[in-house]
Amino acid sequence: TGKKKLLDVMEKNAEHIYKHFITEKNEGAPGHPEVELALMKMYRTTGNKKWLQLAEHFINERGEDPHFYEKEAAKRDWTVWGNDPTAHDYQQSGKPVRAQSDATGHAVRAVYLYTGMAQLSAKSGDNALYDACKRLWESITRRRMYVTGGIGSTVLGEAFSVDYDLPPDTAYAETCASIGLMFFANAMLKNELIGEYADVMETAFYNTVLGGMQLDGKRFFYVNPLEVVPGISGVSPTHRHDLPVRPKWYACACCPPNVARLITSFGCYAYGENSDMSFCHMYADGEIKFENGMELVCKTNYPYDMTVNYSVIKGGRLAIRILERYIHTCA
């Protein structure tokens, strides 16, 4: 919109954070990774390298001192609800990020962190960081992801379990976790144009993210089991988290607004571009205008109809290809 009122508020707060951690050199990284993503967005919007520096600092700090959160808890007479400072896997703080290989802990926290890492590696060219992202990507998609693109199989900590522990009836597979997986996949596409990243992004979108919301947008799943057992799901202590029908709302209502922001920014995931090429990652009916000047019209009823037609309205002065993938990821 070009309006800066909200951005000015964000930068004012970011200046305070920058002063505390960079200027005054205080130790620490955020407990729930997400400010890194906001800082990267602010950097892309403003070009201010301070926000890139701060995001990089938080990513580099995580896991350097695995006991940091324990020290912080000892300074206070209270702790955030449900936050065990000794649970290093839960908060991805057991190792420095470049040494991590297995996706562990709270699934949403994990993929938000990995998204920030992938965004930073794409911007900085940090090969060691991207190598870590690739290892973590393989850990998720080869061994710790449901066929629906759901991740985080255990209710205990809303977390990743061990390899291949993917029970269908007690699955957690939080909607926000699959949204975060889409964030991660999209960030990986900024590093390398590999079809697998788009495949997983599409799988998560059609099978878990959209499934997490009723068609009329009035009811939502927080948890997305692959199997519901009548009389047990939502009732038994072992299955109480797996509800058989979508509730209207939640006390912890992170998923509905997360779905809303993803859908309203869908074009950023369906399409991409660089200096001389435009990309189609997913298929959606509509008009597309790229920053490089190219304009397309896509006509499709995908995924109900496998036909996808593109019309080039404006080619611009650049040599542009559209990269398409085989359609096979929608259930």
Stretches with model-predicted labels:
Residues 1-331:
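Glycan-recognition and catalytic cores of secretory/periplasmic carbohydrate-active enzymes
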